[in-house]
Curated annotation (Swiss-Prot):
The protein's name: Helix-loop-helix protein 15
Function: Transcription factor which binds the E box motif 5'-CA[TC][AG]TG-3'. Involved in modulating physiological aging, probably by regulating expression of branched-chain amino acid transferase-1, bcat-1.
Main location: nucleus
GO molecular function: DNA-binding transcription factor activity, RNA polymerase II-specific; protein dimerization activity; RNA polymerase II cis-regulatory region sequence-specific DNA binding; RNA polymerase II-specific DNA-binding transcription factor binding
Protein origin, superkingdom: Eukaryota
Gene Ontology BP annotations: determination of adult lifespan; positive regulation of DNA-templated transcription; regulation of transcription by RNA polymerase II
Biased composition (Basic residues): 22-32
Annotated bHLH domain residues: 32-84
Annotated stretches, region: Basic motif: 32-45
Region entry Helix-loop-helix motif, spans: 46-84
Length: 89
């Protein structure tokens, strides 16, 4: 049922007898699908981390190079936004 390139042979009689859920499950088990999924996930995580880095760069902390966790960045951002909002009022 697997083809040489790692894809599924969707023309086989066996494949056509499978339920929709089983077809999806088998398709997701192919090396080709797993590699594509891993690549997409890696890009998503890199984008997520880049967004946190950009947000972190906007926050004033002492020392500047202090490493903050993601939750610390979010909490500090909320506090900083509140502080700036209070300054404007």
């Amino acid at each position: 049922m697997l083809m040489e390139d790692g894809g599924l042979d969707t023309t086989s009689e066996e494949y056509r007898k499978l339920s929709k859920a089983e077809r999806r499950k088998r398709r997701r088990a192919t090396p080709k699908y797993r590699n594509l999924h891993a690549t997409r996930e890696r890009i998503r995580v890199e984008s997520f981390n880049m967004a946190f880095s950009q947000l972190r760069a906007l926050l004033p902390t002492l020392p500047v190079e202090k490493k903050l966790s993601k939750i610390e960045i979010l909490r500090f951002s909320i506090a900083y936004i509140s502080f700036l909002d209070n300054l404007l009022q």
